[in-house]
C-alpha cells in the first residue's frame, strides 16, 4: 500500500512549487522505480483553494479530517503564510515533528516555519535571511 505525502496549501498558494515533487511521487522517484507514495492535498477546509496562478484545487482532506498515518508533510509556499488561516497549521506541524515525520516547507512556508521556531535546530534554506 502506498503511503501518503500530505501537501498543505492555503489560498494564493504557489501552484508550481509542489508540481515536480507530486509528479515524482506519482511516477516513482526515478523512472521505472516502484511507486511508494501518493500525494494528497490538505487545506484548512474542504472548499476549493485558489492558487496564485488562478487554479482552483479541491483538497482531499481538511485540517480536521486529515489522516494521522502519513509519510511526510509538505507546506507549499504562497502569499498567505502570515495569515490567521496559516496559524491553524501550527499544531499540525508541531504534531508531525513530535512524531518524527518528515516535514518540508517551500518558500514563504519556510518563513512560517522559522517564525514559529520549527527551524531553530535544523539546517534549512529559505527565501532571504531577512525573512528567516
Protein language model features and the residues they cover:
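Short, hydrophobic beta-strand segments that form beta-sheet elements in well-ordered domains
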Residues: 40-43, 103-107, 123-127
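Extended, subdomain-level signal for the structured scaffold at the beginning of enzyme domains
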Residues: 1-99, 112-121, 132
